[in-house]
Amino acid sequence: MRDYDEVTAFLGEWGPFQRLIFFLLSASIIPNGFNGMSIVFLAGTPEHRCLVPHTVNLSSAWRNHSIPLETKDGRQVPQSCRRYRLATIANFSALGLEPGRDVDLEQLEQENCLDGWEYNKDVFLSTIVTEWDLVCKDDWKAPLTTSLFFVGVLMGSFISGQLSDRFGRKNVLFLTMGMQTGFSFLQLFSVNFEMFTVLFVLVGMGQISNYVAAFVLGTEILSKSIRIIFATLGVCIFYAFGFMVLPLFAYFIRDWRMLLLALTVPGVLCGALWWFIPESPRWLISQGRVKEAEVIIRKAAKFNGIVAPSTIFDPSELQDLNSKKPQSHHIYDLVRTRNIRIITIMSIILWLTISVGYFGLSLDTPNLHGDIYVNCFLLAAVEVPAYVLAWLLLQHLPRRYSISAALFLGGSVLLFIQLVPSELFYLSTALVMVGKFGITSAYSMVYVYTAELYPTVVRNMGVGVSSTASRLGSILSPYFVYLGAYDRFLPYILMGSLTILTAILTLFFPESFGAPLPDTIDQMLRVKGIKQWQIQSQTRTQKDGGESPTVLKSTAF
């Protein structure tokens, strides 16, 4: 029986129809790029200090010395969360005493910012941090907002596949596109931090569901030779384009509500794609809607200037296709044998670490020296060559060496940052860009690599579990950035160390480059070291007079 690709081979590989679908589905991902990272500017924390009300009767000298100083990055700056007790310094001011000359400031009693804060408006006019005072004792709320967004992404990744299988790829694509745009718009009317955060969780659910639906729809419509390019370059590069657009919007629109309003406009415009993007013929056939699938295929043929055959799907082939029942497998199968259990655990570690590094560096933009808008643009732009490099490596070089090298590059430069003198801050920023380049390349390659490691019977499940680990990494990443408030090098030390350890771990994965995809668990490639363990086990068994087990051949380390 012919498969779907053989049946539709008459359409060609790269005709006008395929090019249109490739571009439109990739373009639908652009809003995902700036919605996911918009929190960098929506929750930006400007320099701030305790507010000293104008109603307090202070001399100009005491008003200028009302905030204690602290040493930060080798210079004296006003503290952000403390001030001298106003009642005390008001009395000194009334008595005509001068700060520093008549009064030792180090001996003065201090207090919290009881009247709120005043914020520097050179970078941001307004953010959710300045509007709801998410600083000092409430500074944990901003990273929590980001983490909960990724919790929404995690929930969306669970339900998106089921919704897509039940209601169709196209319907779910545009439903979740509307969900992402609609809830982003509703965030404009947030009256408090809690309302904003709940809506942001729903935006996260829509974002990942939209991404998955577009990804699946493209892989099902496009031909075999185009699918890999679509998966590694198409959606990824257009996501990076969306990320690159974000700082351009944010530079010209520095009020968080107006910025959010501007970011919803492209999502609304994407709604017009409904009339150009078809449903997946594969999904229609799986639902028994063969005539609808044929209509789409014939329109594609006409668009490509090709005459479709009179009969596209043979009734007997469809009957054979519908009679095939997939064998049931459970998540337990991912740990059923020693080999697949080790691969699953290693994959979870690999995905989690890469995700922490990718999102941690993306969210760390405000902490970099230099202009935040330029730095954000560069962190987004560096993803484009990273994706191109990943695609080239996947075409020509072994997987585990490629991923390990990319991770080692990313991790090592992050560790070097702490050695850079403070006056060479541009070098530190450049090292962060190189680190983002390496980790992004690994992120792009790990999707293909994981799919090649798992057998057909549990491939979707294996990639799904690994992807879930990635979501957990993204949830943790804001708190890696948060540690920079205590030591600006600590996030880089942690992310760099984890990335290098994972690069070493990757070398123990089996090599799938050039190997046929396994169909069963027994056909899986062996983890490095498993063969030696089996040989030792066989020797012990033979000494005991038992039957020697079969040793599967593995690729040499």
From Swiss-Prot:
Disordered: region residues: 537-557
Keyword Cell inner membrane: no
Catalysed reactions, semicolon-separated: (R)-carnitine(out) + Na(+)(out) = (R)-carnitine(in) + Na(+)(in); O-acetyl-(R)-carnitine(out) + Na(+)(out) = O-acetyl-(R)-carnitine(in) + Na(+)(in); O-propanoyl-(R)-carnitine(out) + Na(+)(out) = O-propanoyl-(R)-carnitine(in) + Na(+)(in); glycine betaine(out) + Na(+)(out) = glycine betaine(in) + Na(+)(in)
Activity-regulation annotation: Inhibited by emetine, quinidine and verapamil. The IC(50) of emetine is 4.2 uM. Not inhibited by valproic acid. Transport of (R)-carnitine is stimulated by cholesterol in the plasma membrane.
Transmembrane segments: 21-41, 143-163, 173-193, 198-218, 233-253, 258-278, 342-362, 374-394, 407-427, 431-451, 463-483, 489-509
GO molecular function (one): amino-acid betaine transmembrane transporter activity
Positions where Phosphoserine occurs in the chain: S548
Residue positions with a glycan: N57, N64, N91
CDD domains named in the record: MFS_SLC22A4_5_OCTN1_2
Gene Ontology cellular component terms for the protein in this record: apical plasma membrane; basal plasma membrane; basolateral plasma membrane; brush border membrane; cytoplasm; cytosol; plasma membrane
Residues bearing the modification Phosphothreonine: T550
Record topology, Extracellular segments: 42-142, 194-197, 254-257, 363-373, 428-430, 484-488
Its membrane topology: Multi-pass membrane protein
Tissue specificity field: Expressed in the proximal and distal tubules and in the glomeruli in the kidney, in the myocardium, valves, and arterioles in the heart, in the labyrinthine layer of the placenta, and in the cortex, hippocampus, and cerebellum in the brain. Expressed in Sertoli cells in testis.
Any one of the GO BP annotations: reproductive structure development
Residue ranges that the UniProt entry lists as topological domain Cytoplasmic: 1-20, 164-172, 219-232, 279-341, 395-406, 452-462, 510-557
Residues recorded as bearing Phosphotyrosine in the entry: Y486
Subcellular location as annotated: Cell membrane; Apical cell membrane; Basal cell membrane
Alphabetized UniProt keyword annotations: ATP-binding, Cell membrane, Glycoprotein, Ion transport, Membrane, Nucleotide-binding, Phosphoprotein, Sodium, Sodium transport, Symport, Transmembrane, Transmembrane helix, Transport
Record-listed ATP binding positions: G218, T219, E220, I221, L222, S223, K224, S225
Keyword Transmembrane: yes
Family statement drawn from the similarity comment of this UniProt entry: Belongs to the major facilitator (TC 2.A.1) superfamily. Organic cation transporter (TC 2.A.1.19) family.
NCBIfam families membership: 2A0119 (TIGR00898)
Function: Sodium-ion dependent, high affinity carnitine transporter. Involved in the active cellular uptake of carnitine. Transports one sodium ion with one molecule of carnitine. Also transports organic cations such as tetraethylammonium (TEA) without the involvement of sodium. Also relative uptake activity ratio of carnitine to TEA is 11.3. May also contribute to regulate the transport of organic compounds in testis across the blood-testis-barrier.
Assembly mode: Interacts with PDZK1.
Protein name: Organic cation/carnitine transporter 2
